[in-house]
Amino acid sequence: MSSDFPHYNFRMPNIGFQNLPLNIYIVVFGTAVFVFILSLLFCCYLIRLRHQAHKEFYAYKQVILKEKVKELNLHELCAVCLEDFKPRDELGICPCKHAFHRKCLVKWLEVRKVCPLCNMPVLQLAQLHSKQDRGPPQEPLPGAENIV
């Protein structure tokens, strides 16, 4: 049977990395660029999500109460912890103008994204409020020092 099929001795040429055709380099380089661009897009997406979460978390105005002022209409106590406002307290003021201790408001907004007093959505109000802020500049609240 071996006489029916002649035996040929073929050897594959030894192709090194230097002898590869240019098309292979283009494919490898193109794949690397594609993976790099995908990773950049993914990083930008993650940064955008983090930025959006940061905006949602701080959708209220932070101020420090300098002194007790009647013009602020603060109701003199925090509706979340039921403690009186004191000078130098850090306050969080919702876009609906209700004020709370900043720490109380942060804990409240972690659970619910609404104002503790009027149940208005804080994020929707903040978005509407930011659109209205593009108009004439508003003066700071009397008796409060803006920290944001």
Curated annotation (Swiss-Prot):
<keyword id="KW-0472">Membrane</keyword>
<comment type="subunit">
    <text>Interacts with TRPC1, TRPC3, TRPC4, TRPC5, TRPC6 and TRPC7.</text>
</comment>
<dbReference type="InterPro" id="IPR011016">
    <property type="entry name" value="Znf_RING-CH"/>
</dbReference>
<protein>
    <recommendedName>
        <fullName>RING finger protein 24</fullName>
    </recommendedName>
</protein>
<comment type="function">
    <text>May play a role in TRPCs intracellular trafficking.</text>
</comment>
<feature type="transmembrane region" description="Helical">
    <location>
        <begin position="24"/>
        <end position="44"/>
    </location>
</feature>
<dbReference type="GO" id="GO:0000139">
    <property type="term" value="C:Golgi membrane"/>
</dbReference>
<keyword id="KW-0333">Golgi apparatus</keyword>
<keyword id="KW-0812">Transmembrane</keyword>
<dbReference type="InterPro" id="IPR001841">
    <property type="entry name" value="Znf_RING"/>
</dbReference>
<dbReference type="GO" id="GO:0008270">
    <property type="term" value="F:zinc ion binding"/>
</dbReference>
<dbReference type="InterPro" id="IPR050731">
    <property type="entry name" value="HRD1_E3_ubiq-ligases"/>
</dbReference>
<dbReference type="InterPro" id="IPR048025">
    <property type="entry name" value="RNF24_RING-H2"/>
</dbReference>
<dbReference type="Pfam" id="PF13639">
    <property type="entry name" value="zf-RING_2"/>
</dbReference>
<feature type="zinc finger region" description="RING-type">
    <location>
        <begin position="78"/>
        <end position="119"/>
    </location>
</feature>
<keyword id="KW-0863">Zinc-finger</keyword>
<keyword id="KW-0479">Metal-binding</keyword>
<dbReference type="InterPro" id="IPR013083">
    <property type="entry name" value="Znf_RING/FYVE/PHD"/>
</dbReference>
<keyword id="KW-1133">Transmembrane helix</keyword>
<keyword id="KW-0862">Zinc</keyword>
